[in-house]
């Protein structure tokens, strides 16, 4: 009789091709996602050595990081470096025969939204991409993580990856969430508790009633930020919610293949008595709408709190807090709800899905953004954009004063035209608030879509629950 295994153990064991004496393993990779920024050198390496892509049918490419989100981008991209990278991906996809969603394709979008949307991401798979937020796909019970450019070339050439196994960590969210609290609040609260190094060396399995009650889109938000918590990957065991989401998608199994896959997927859970090296438990009812105040995702507090003083920290974190407050232009003791906002960004692979847009639109309906506010919504894919237009969400955003953009990574990172100016303060639904992340000397506060919408209306960080009470 075999020892009880975690979900991570099971997926890992099913993909080990070879294990060396020191524990280093060669893992088979089921899906390789590719974008324009981390792939050019990898494809060039294949050309120089005369190699082909080993499994083009399992390789999916889409430009997303530095594409403009304004009209006309399918015929002209002004930034030379961006244009060269997108053109290179066009050529590489054609030359190597991989699956490709170009800028002109309505299915184009952020790679971590396109993959699940098209049914490429399935339970029990190994998924890699030259991008740290590949952890998103763990919401399906897939082992998914980012890789470097040299590893991108290795996977393209061999469909395998060399790595050592991580340790097992469990994050359990018990009970149910209160109204106004979202998946974004869960994942930020976990990072706030454990720190950005709390998951280092681990693969996290998220579980508990609050996780089970999330939609697939909410689960993707939670797993998306596992990397911000230091983890190699994040996982959620697949269940009926997962299966219902996957069924009928373009690249999901059909007929007898579906039944066979479903039979396997139902074995993907952590066995009773399986060992975790680290366990963190949070009560769902204790989680509130949160916002980051500093320059690390762990600098997070409930929206009802005040800006902390550096003296509240210890060790090296005292100076880090002092630097964060200086960069963010904040004073200890001020209410978070008194922090004025210049810009609101709703989008990214964390919160650019249709449910995120619905949540924001519900707050914005019939309202206008604050005078002088710059606000934009960037759907995570062309299909999300089309659905939002069909549901009337786009018109709500436009009527409120938001810019309604094309799909892409946009203001999540300063690699395209959507950037903050020095000193500009943004309430953002993205995943990182590092110095300069959204533009040189820009200031980022990470929030949920509803919180972002509330800030757009009032002009300052706002408790979304107050807005929800007004709409009842």
Curated annotation (Swiss-Prot):
Gene3D superfamilies from the xrefs? Aconitase, domain 3 (3.30.499.10)
- Any single Pfam family the record assigns to this protein: Aconitase
Per the record, the pathway is: Amino-acid biosynthesis; L-leucine biosynthesis; L-leucine from 3-methyl-2-oxobutanoate: step 2/4
The record's InterPro entries line, in alphabetical order, gives:
3-IsopropMal_deHydase_lsu, Acnase/IPM_dHydase_lsu_aba_1/3, Acoase/IPM_deHydtase_lsu_aba, Aconitase_4Fe-4S_BS, Aconitase_4Fe-4S_dom, IPM_dehydratase_rel_enz, IPMI_cat
Record carries keyword Iron-sulfur: yes
Binding sites annotated in the UniProt record for [4Fe-4S] cluster: 349, 409, 412
What EC number(s) is this enzyme filed under?
A: 4.2.1.33
Cofactor(s) required, per the database record: [4Fe-4S] cluster
What are the protein's GO molecular function terms?
Answer: 3-isopropylmalate dehydratase activity; 4 iron, 4 sulfur cluster binding; metal ion binding
What SUPFAM superfamilies does the annotation carry?
Aconitase iron-sulfur domain
Q: How is the cofactor bound?
A: Binds 1 [4Fe-4S] cluster per subunit.
Q: Which reaction does it catalyse?
A: (2R,3S)-3-isopropylmalate = (2S)-2-isopropylmalate
Q: Name one GO biological process term.
A: L-leucine biosynthetic process
User: Which keywords label this protein?
Assistant: 4Fe-4S, Amino-acid biosynthesis, Branched-chain amino acid biosynthesis, Iron, Iron-sulfur, Leucine biosynthesis, Lyase, Metal-binding
Provide the family line: Belongs to the aconitase/IPM isomerase family. LeuC type 1 subfamily.
The family database entries (NCBIfam families) matched by this protein are listed as: leuC, PRK05478.1, PRK12466.1
Description of how the protein assembles with itself and partners = Heterodimer of LeuC and LeuD.
Q: What is its biological role? A: Catalyzes the isomerization between 2-isopropylmalate and 3-isopropylmalate, via the formation of 2-isopropylmaleate.
Protein name as annotated: 3-isopropylmalate dehydratase large subunit
What is the organism of origin for this protein? Cereibacter sphaeroides (strain ATCC 17025 / ATH 2.4.3)
